């Protein structure tokens, strides 16, 4: 008598570890970007009762560094292509290296070292975002990361938190340092939501209509918060973003009709774009008084003109090498040799990233940054045609640059510097020809 044994094969569901890790990485990037808006960090640590102390500054710096280190490690593991390093990304890293080297001749070397290291770290974090995520993913991450601080700020205003509203001029600050710290997250959230809505309308995937409605609601929320901040800096930067987006959208339509070749894009259209941007900048500064009167004098530089004059005079003192990154404003002689120095002796920056770059790195540092910006634009011309929202690269770059004329946004530990680096460096789905 024989015994028959039947074996039943049971398939155990596989645990998709890679998928889970990807979502963990998404969560990490959202948290990192939210931290680099600086509002949450300022609110948490300044509530510790150590406001104004050296311990508080060290704690805040350590917090920013801690949340960016995983990005640097992941970038090191994934690497950067030789094509990127031999192009504008290499020049951008050269700019950060120059500012780091400026510590050697800085007039306030200890401060310059900390500032230049943080500049480099945040640049690497921006490269990590560009290297690791597609344009669609980047836009989604930027959008989601901006919302927590904005929602908490809205809650803070509604519940009368201390410092959430400037009652003298009735503008909102929320959990941020000031209105020009509160407005950029609202502006980026608004722009990222708009770019995502653009992609949905163009692609029309499943559920595109309800998703577009949700994005529209987010845009209205962020725009409302931006308006309540009364920040003319971010509103003006958004205006330039829209102009740049419209310019490249028009070019995109003309190019699709085969009226413009790739060579013409590089040799004619791109120089024309740069000329228009320079012309608009010149008009803005030349006729600023008329613009102010048009806006009923609600736009003003809040005393920044004097800061810029000090910065320009300081640049002329050391035009080639500069004073060292963020070193000038921490040098006593920088004030005492100039008229009205006592009025701004407590200031530690120029209220203009353009002036900060000239002061910190001189002509060499400024030249490296300008070269990186121009070269990145030339390399990314193909995106205008190949990506559904390829206009984002140029529009986001000039959005940050426009805002940086009024605030020190080219600085370490700030999401605007990370955004600029990511926009200039591209995205994971790029297939950009070598220029």
Regions found by a protein language model. Name each.
Residues 31-33, 213-220, 348, 352, ...:
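Loop-to-helix entry and N-terminal half of a specific, functionally important transmembrane alpha helix
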Residues 131, 269, 360-401:
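Hydrophobic transmembrane alpha-helices and their immediate junctions
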Residues 223, 231, 312, 319, ...:
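A conserved mid-to-late transmembrane alpha helix and its immediate loop/hinge
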Residues 68-72, 96-101, 137-167, 176-252, ...:
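Alpha-helical transmembrane segments of multi-pass inner-membrane proteins
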Residues 68-80, 97-154, 402:
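Transmembrane alpha-helical segments and their membrane-water interfaces
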Residues 2-76, 97-105, 400-402:
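N-terminal signal-anchor transmembrane segment
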Residues 191, 238-246, 393-435:
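Transmembrane alpha-helices of multi-pass inner-membrane enzymes
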Residues 293-309, 317, 321-361:
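Long extracytoplasmic/lumenal interhelical loops at the membrane interface
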